[in-house]
Amino acid sequence: MICMCDVPRYADADMEEIRKMREAHTVLKHVDYEPKELYHGYTDKRLKIDLSSNSVEILDIPEEVKEKFTGGKGYCLRYLWDDTTPDTKWDSPENAITMSAGPIAGITQYAGTGKCLVCTISPMTDIPIDSNVGGYFGPFLKFSGFDVIELTGKAEEDVIIVIDGNKGTISIEKAPMEHLDSHVLGEELTAMYAEDENDRKNVAVVCSGSAAEHCNLSMLNFTFFDPKRNVVRLKQAGRGGIGRVFANKHIKALVCHFKGVKANLNHVYDISLLNKDGLKFHREVATLDNKQNAMRKSGTAYSLRTLSDYDILPTRNYKYGGTDRIDEMAP
């Protein structure tokens, strides 16, 4: 599930209130590191944070893991496997939330490279679940030096994890004053960790919101700042109740700041081939989207209509592949 909404700009950024919120933070852990430059889409580094002990580890990813699991969902599932046992439940401290963007993450000339995969053991099924989400967090994490992040353990109180890929810093901070609702929290943290108004586009926030305190089927919200509309927008990793696991670990938010995205920051193997295929892909999307998917106009919800038209929309427990009531469901 991927959906999107816009939220109003944070009250012309009441920066005095933001300053008070930040001053109320208690830094539980601070780590300086040297961000590794990408080579052919990889840094071969993973970031592992244990909230029970406030430990932060930067670990190597072996070549054989890269060859077999590639990145994205592969890395997420591999390191979820390493962190858990057959007896691990969704609310066990060792249950990990893993996030990874693939080797082409953030390539500006190829559509869809903002995607990030998220995995955990689901509170709905007690088995692994994955969900994908757009926005900027995946590329920012990659450009900050990490192919995958693992969040394990449980904090004693609500914390915010902050990664700054330009400064080379990682911190775990107790954050008592910020709002819990994602549409407000995203605005607050974007204003808090941006260097100025022009820097807001370089901040991505992951949060679960207040619903995750009450409901297993809760999502993770990923923010990004839209300069054209001058608003913070939200996308969701909506499957499997990952937000519930996030909140159960007492993570109020995960913030990543990175400034300096450019066309070939991950140094792909053959940029000329990528440019050629990217141009072809962009042309197809621009020409065919309005006729086939209407994603630009209507978003993910329109896919229900497409699935029903092709008789592959699960209906009445998969008894049918479509419905004549699709006008009530899809735009």
Where are these regions (language model features)?
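Intrinsically disordered, low-complexity segments enriched in small residues
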Residues: 2-132, 136-331
